[in-house]
């Protein structure tokens, strides 16, 4: 019995999808009965692709014996034929693939007046989500984002294996990564290209900017942020916005660190927010002059040395230094106030 015409509803134009038939209305590898690839035209109407049907008549038509079948439809949203299922049962899906599914069970395959069987009402559902990153530059001398690229980690494992009995993609692991690009930046607010990502339950993502140029400042691999409690549902549309401000405040000819210095383990860092402070004499924020030790009474009365300067150790080393008397006086003389604090201090 030829099973060639199919009737789709609101599907994408110029895409190919594969149909897999399972006899006895049971979706198992043992009940595999055949497969064929169909292609939609510019109006979204589908027709069989030549030489893709198994089993097939001499004419190339897809042929199935009369009976009750379950049909599984899948596509990657492209104009290329989806690969046949491995073992007539499973395939893989990766990030940035527009994987779509449809399943119809209890289909009575029998001849109509034309001697064929029509599969009607095929409507695909997207199984991946769409994700876009947005970068907003603030408080730089020039806020134009000229170059931008990033890597997102913590996504669902990729590839993921899907089998024909599943109506959705499984959610597995947190080892997936995605490279994100910006085709046309050159603005203070720039949106990345849109990407497909596998669905995921709530988790924390890490976004590392591998390439970043704001104004004249090149900051490759210098900024990494976390996005918490991120859920990506099938067919959802998501945008993560990252605001980037300089980690310094310009006062006359010097750049002063925006955040307080603290020590964690053997490394030195600046606080993420200007108001943050590691309280307590031994909790990392109490740092003496010219020493890498922390705590009350820890200081070095000898000559200044970059090897002993905690500011100098902040990654990348050599970017910062403890201010000299002259530099501190320069800030005081500038008459700068911040949030109502005394002149020259904040």
Outline where the language-model segments fall:
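Hydrophilic extracytoplasmic domains
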Residues: 215-251, 319-320, 337-344
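Conserved positions within compact, well-structured domain cores
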Residues: 245-346
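Hydrophobic beta-strand residues in large extracellular and virion-surface proteins
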Residues: 17-19, 71, 148-152, 205-209, ...
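Short, low-hydrophobicity acidic/polar segments
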Residues: 1-140, 191, 201, 211-213, ...
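Generic recognition of long tandem-repeat/solenoid scaffolds
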Residues: 48-60, 180, 189-192, 257, ...
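Solvent-exposed serine/threonine-rich low-complexity stretches and specific carbohydrate-binding patches
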Residues: 31-53, 161-185, 225-228
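Extended serine/threonine-enriched, polar tracts that run as long, contiguous segments within proteins
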Residues: 152, 180-227
């Amino acid at each position: 019995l030829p099973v060639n015409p199919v009737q789709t509803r609101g599907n994408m134009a110029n895409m190919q999808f594969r149909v897999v038939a399972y006899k006895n209305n049971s979706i198992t590898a043992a009940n595999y009965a055949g497969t064929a690839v169909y292609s939609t035209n510019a109006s979204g109407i589908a027709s069989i692709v030549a030489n893709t049907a198994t089993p097939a008549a001499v004419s190339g038509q897809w042929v199935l014996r009369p009976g009750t079948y379950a049909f599984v439809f899948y596509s990657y949203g492209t104009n290329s034929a989806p690969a046949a299922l491995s073992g007539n049962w499973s395939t893989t899906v990766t990030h940035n693939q527009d994987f779509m599914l449809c399943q119809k069970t209890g289909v009575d395959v029998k001849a109509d007046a034309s001697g064929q069987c029509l599969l009607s009402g095929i409507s695909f559902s997207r199984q991946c989500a769409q994700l876009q990153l947005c970068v907003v530059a603030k408080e730089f001398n020039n806020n134009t984002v000229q170059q931008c690229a990033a890597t997102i980690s913590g996504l669902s494992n990729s590839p993921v294996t899907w089998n024909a009995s599943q109506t959705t993609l499984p959610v597995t692991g947190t080892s997936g990564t995605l490279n994100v690009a910006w085709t046309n930046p050159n603005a203070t607010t720039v949106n990345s290209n849109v990407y497909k990502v596998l669905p995921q339950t709530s988790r924390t993502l890490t976004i590392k900017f591998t390439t970043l140029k704001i104004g004249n400042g090149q900051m490759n691999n210098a900024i990494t942020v976390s996005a918490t409690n991120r859920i990506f549902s099938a067919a959802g549309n998501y945008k993560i916005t990252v605001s980037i401000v300089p980690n310094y405040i310009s006062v006359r000819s010097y750049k002063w660190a925006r955040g307080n210095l603290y020590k964690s383990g053997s490394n030195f860092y600046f606080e993420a927010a200007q108001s943050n402070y590691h309280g307590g004499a031994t909790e990392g924020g109490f740092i003496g002059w010219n020493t890498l030790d922390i705590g009350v009474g820890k200081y070095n009365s000898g000559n200044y040395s970059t090897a002993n300067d905690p500011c100098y150790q902040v990654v990348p080393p050599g970017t910062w230094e403890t201010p000299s008397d002259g530099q501190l006086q320069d800030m005081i003389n500038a008459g700068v106030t911040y949030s109502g604090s005394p002149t020259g201090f904040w």
